[in-house]
Regions:
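Contiguous mid-protein beta-loop-alpha structural module that forms a pocket-lining wall or clamp
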Residues: 103, 107-147
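Non-catalytic, conserved peripheral segments adjacent to functional cores
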Residues: 140-244, 261-262, 268, 273-283, ...
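Flexible, glycine/small-residue-enriched loop-and-beta-strand segment within the central core
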Residues: 2-98, 123-124, 130-136
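Residues at the C-termini of beta-strands that transition into short coil/loop
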Residues: 67, 114, 124, 131, ...
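Conserved metal-binding segment of the jelly-roll/cupin
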Residues: 42, 106-109, 113, 239-260
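A conserved hydrophobic position in a structured secondary element of the catalytic/binding core
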Residues: 122, 248, 268
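Short beta-strand segments in beta-sandwich/barrel cores
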Residues: 61-63, 110, 222-227
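Proline-anchored loop/turn motifs at beta-strand termini and strand-loop-strand connectors
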Residues: 16, 52, 115, 249-250
């Protein structure tokens, strides 16, 4: 265990040997600091606070104390997920959970749960980005310079089987037209569709995966951003034209956010609605996806 001489660990606290505690960090009974965590200094870890493996708190981070430390109310507990990072001077309110890989900007005030790999800023904190390890910028550049049909109309995003599609767009004095064909350009025949609209700019949609259902997304009006994640790679793409669509195969975690005020997102689905087909918890998605990958490699 590595920690400053001014750090204090109370009896009943759990601190992994590989954790690093900075100046004037106090870990109270019932707090749990996981492997490879780092708390840089001037932070109190109250009873019930849990830092999961690899989490990092910058200097002067404030974790709101539970209303009654003796009550053991799990709803008051703060959980900082694996590899999550919290910037200097941020405030995390009681009961908040930061998902795996989430990033909290310096000085942010976080009063709501933060999804895995989301980047939040401001007071109150709002999602402004997602951590990516694959960039969609080259694909967007292709879309902006391509002239249909001189260049390919389907481009892989580098995230599993996710693909970006560009359709015919015809300009006419009577009104413009964009057209695509199912089972030819769109890789399945839909069983249903739905429209998403009137989404506040600070809200997210999606945040789930499907076990069997395939989806195809087109922002027919306005703009929105789509984050796709297959556990190995993660990428964000902006849908900003009615001739642009993105295909999500099964077992792809999908998020839609950054909706413009006039955005209308059309989603085609290969299956009828089935609540059992949804995976709404990212930790559950990780478990099932890893099992599926292991089965493929066996």
């Amino acid at each position: 265990m590595s920690h400053s001489d001014t750090a204090r660990i109370h009896a009943g606290a759990t601190v992994a040997p590989s954790a690093i505690l900075g100046d004037f960090v106090v870990v109270y009974p019932g707090a749990d600091v996981g492997a490879d965590c780092r708390v840089r200094g001037y932070t109190q870890l109250w009873p019930g606070v849990r830092l999961e493996a690899g989490a990092e708190l910058g200097p002067g981070v404030t974790l709101e104390a539970p209303e009654s430390p003796e009550s053991g109310n799990a709803g008051d507990s703060i959980v900082i997920g694996p590899q999550a990072r919290v910037g200097a001077g941020a405030l995390i309110c009681r009961g908040v959970r930061l998902g795996q890989g989430a990033v909290v900007a310096a000085g942010a005030v976080v009063a709501q749960n933060v999804p895995p790999y989301a980047v939040v800023t401001g007071s109150p904190a709002r999602i402004t980005d997602y951590v990516q390890n694959t960039s969609g910028a080259p694909v967007m550049a292709w879309h902006q310079r391509a002239t249909f049909p001189e260049q390919p109309s389907v481009v892989p995003l580098g995230v599993g089987g996710v693909t970006l599609h560009r359709f015919k767009f015809l300009q006419d004095p009577r009104g413009d037209l964009s057209v695509g064909e199912f089972s030819r350009e769109i890789p399945f025949t839909p069983s249903r569709y739905f429209l998403v609209m009137n989404v506040p700019s600070d809200k997210n949609r999606g945040e789930h995966a499907h076990r069997e259902c395939q989806q195809f997304l087109v922002c027919v009006k306005g703009t929105c951003s789509v984050v796709v994640d297959d556990l190995e790679q993660r990428c964000e793409i902006q849908l900003d034209s009615p001739d642009l669509g993105v295909y999500l195969p099964p077992m792809t975690w999908g998020i839609q956010y950054k909706y413009s005020s006039d955005a209308v997102l059309m989603v085609f689905a290969s299956h009828y609605y089935d609540a059992a087909d949804y995976i709404r918890d990212y930790d559950e998605f990780v478990i099932e996806k890893r099992a599926a990958l292991a089965k493929e490699q066996a």
